[in-house]
Amino acid sequence: MRVISYNLRKNRASGELVALAERYSPNILCLQECNTIDLPAEVGNLHLADSTRRNRLGLAIYYNKDRFTAVKTQAFALKKSLHDHLAAPAHERLIATRLVDNVAHREFVVASFHAAPLTALNSLRRNQIRTAHEELSLLGPGLPTLMVGDYNYPIFQGKLGNKVNQSGYDLTLSDTRTYTRYKFFRGHFDLATSMGLMVSNVETLPQGTSDHMPILVTATYSDENKMQTDAAQHGAHRSESVSAEGADFII
């Protein structure tokens, strides 16, 4: 599956979405800082699952209805930073959709996440990430899960990786930095955490009008890779036995 995550910088980059969908053919689109009051029902061939409701600039998830069927979408409030208490910019920092994959005939959970801004401590963001993962496990117990978005975590990502590993998740950074607005805070802000999925690539896409660059996550189901490996090994064993019996040909 192919998932794009994009922080629109107060909805400024909203006009780029159709072109992104057409150029990169994502199955899912996860947005942060989008105008939730005026979201289109469709972006290219992607359908709006839902968006956050309690803040004008919020989160949204779009998905390909030919590939997926939406079972349930839910928004979550996470622990607030001082900035949230004073400015109240975001009540809900997580939205997630439980989907049925009509191709693989299985369910999984995808989420769009926006952590507290850099005025907060990394410890608060780790709390938000941990709580988000716990909420996702309740939405889809035991299901493969992908949470993408603006983690606002440009430094000490090794520690973050260790923390999410302890809860059964993997942290994956993109191939190049995703944020360039401030000289001293450039780096990987937009990340992916996953469980039960094999993330083969996270690509930083070209910059548009946002201060964040979109990322494109390519992932497969972990046990699907195992089944393919087992099948290949079974085929290899079979080839060896045939070769031993028939010296005139090799399969």
Which residues make up each language-model segment?
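Acidic/histidine-rich helix-loop elements
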Residues: 3-11, 80-88, 119-121
